[in-house]
């Protein structure tokens, strides 16, 4: 029988609706060294508003290129939509602490309390709003595990837009119910790489039997957008605009901690392209950059796709088909195809340019973990905290447990905060593999990564 637990504070901390952030925070405004600009692959020069107009919505381009405006006011229609599921709770993981026997205090920001099951809705509704405001017919996008595609399909349905989703093939096959949610919201869902685009045909020819990647799906979605009048491409991670919208997570987290009188010592987030991590940590990074406070910030990525920990900081294509602008980021090479691991949302070869610059400046640090260890942590969390976590989120849980056990050894009572990005109820194939002992770890060899990095584009300067 579990020992009784004495609470020294609330389990859940909710902000009032009137405490919902009224503006997104742009961490670039506080970075003395700004992220390197996107480059036009044709000219090798920084992209302009006009370069991006055929691909992105106009207002989103302005947000993408603006390194100086600290706060962007959130439009009233978006704030009203946010109130359906925000503010989200900051939860004290008392039962996990008890199971670990750690003196650390563990908090998690839970973003899975909406139909999309994740934080992705924060940016999806914003991007759909700007597409509708521009008078577009529809949007195209990619999705890995399906959370982003689900969030976008919800948002386009809300605003009456068409939605075309290219879903990474391995996730399309592993998560059939996720695609049915998207279709319920009116989206069309195509496994990527497909035979419906030129880029998809090329990738299938070069990599027969490939299970796909986010880089492949991005290429197909961009091609589909530029070939259809009245359509634009929207992206669920990586871009500056996405991290801007996701800052609502960190702003709420900081406000809730302040309400509790708690200062975070360590902040942990999973990292694929950077949307969740960037959103969670940006207000804390801002304080750190301004010299107002110090925080230990840890990014956690899959060992099968270790962009930060084994990648190179260089200009690279954001997509496998090499149709997108070049971004300076930690990358494994745009031709790198990760193994078919179960954290589909983290299978991206690169990383946000903002987070890449912060990592290069040692403002944040990173680690990588194997998926079997990730699911061990996920199972313990489910059994103690009553939420079945998404595989992506469980990378942060794994690192949180490891750090809390270090506190057990040292006796430190650190305040650890992590991002629980979403739920894993559509990831039961992955949980089944783990429970049956059939899950294995794939870690790319140095030769695998070197082969991909050898194909990085040559960029002067």
Task: List the predicted regions and their residue ranges.
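Positively charged, low-complexity intrinsically disordered leader regions
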Residues: 2-136
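Active-site/ligand-binding loops adjacent to catalytic centers
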Residues: 71-73, 203-241, 249, 260-261, ...
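A glycine-rich, Thr/Ser-enriched phosphate-binding loop motif common to dinucleotide/cofactor-binding enzymes
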Residues: 115-126, 239-252, 390-395
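A short, small-residue-rich loop immediately preceding and capping a beta-strand
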Residues: 123, 131-170, 263-277, 297, ...
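Alpha-helix C-terminal capping segments
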Residues: 126-136, 150-162, 183-184, 281-291, ...
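Claisen-condensing/thiolase-fold acyl-transfer catalytic domains that form or cleave C-C bonds
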Residues: 271-279, 371-436
């Amino acid at each position: 029988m579990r020992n009784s637990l004495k609470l020294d504070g609330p389990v859940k901390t909710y902000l009032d609706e009137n405490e919902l952030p009224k503006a997104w925070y742009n961490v670039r405004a506080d970075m003395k060294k700004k992220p390197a600009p996107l480059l036009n692959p044709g000219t090798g020069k920084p992209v302009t508003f006009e370069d991006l107009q055929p691909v992105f919505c106009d207002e989103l381009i302005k947000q993408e290129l603006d390194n100086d405006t600290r706060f962007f006011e959130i439009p009233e229609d978006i704030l009203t939509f946010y109130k359906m599921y925000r503010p989200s709770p900051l939860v004290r993981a008392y039962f996990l602490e008890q199971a670990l026997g750690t003196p650390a205090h563990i908090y998690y920001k839970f973003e899975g309390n909406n139909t999309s099951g994740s934080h992705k809705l924060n940016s999806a509704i914003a991007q759909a709003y700007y597409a509708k405001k521009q008078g577009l017919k529809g949007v195209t996008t990619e999705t890995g595990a399906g959370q982003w595609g689900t969030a976008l399909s919800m948002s386009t349905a809300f605003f009456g837009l068409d939605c075309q989703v290219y879903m990474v093939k391995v996730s399309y096959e592993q998560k059939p119910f996720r695609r049915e949610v998207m279709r319920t919201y009116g989206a069309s869902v195509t496994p990527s790489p497909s035979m419906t685009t030129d880029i998809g045909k090329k990738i299938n020819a070069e990599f027969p039997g490939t299970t796909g990647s986010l880089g492949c799906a991005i290429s197909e979605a961009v091609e589909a957008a530029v070939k259809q009048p009245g359509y634009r491409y929207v992206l669920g991670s990586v871009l500056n605009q996405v991290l801007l919208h996701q800052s609502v997570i960190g702003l709420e987290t900081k406000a809730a901690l302040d309400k509790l009188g708690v200062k975070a010592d360590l902040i942990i987030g999973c990292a694929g392209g950077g949307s969740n991590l960037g959103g969670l940590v940006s207000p804390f990074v801002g304080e750190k950059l301004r010299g107002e406070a110090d925080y230990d910030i840890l990014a956690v990525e899959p060992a099968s796709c270790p962009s930060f920990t084994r990648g190179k900081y260089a200009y690279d294509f954001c997509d496998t088909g090499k149709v997108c602008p070049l971004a300076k980021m930690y990358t494994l090479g745009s031709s790198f195809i990760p193994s078919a691991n179960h954290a589909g949302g983290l299978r991206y070869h690169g990383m946000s340019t903002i987070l890449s610059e912060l990592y290069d400046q040692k403002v944040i640090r990173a680690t990588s973990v194997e998926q079997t260890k990730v699911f061990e942590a996920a199972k313990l969390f489910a059994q103690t905290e009553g939420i079945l976590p998404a595989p992506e989120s469980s990378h942060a849980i794994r690192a949180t447990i490891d750090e809390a056990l270090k506190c057990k050894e040292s006796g430190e009572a650190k305040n650890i905060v992590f991002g629980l990005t979403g739920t894993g109820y559509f990831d039961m194939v992955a949980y089944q593999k783990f429970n049956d002992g059939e899950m294995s770890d794939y870690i790319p060899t140095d030769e695998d990564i070197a082969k991909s990095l050898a194909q990085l584009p040559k960029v002067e300067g």
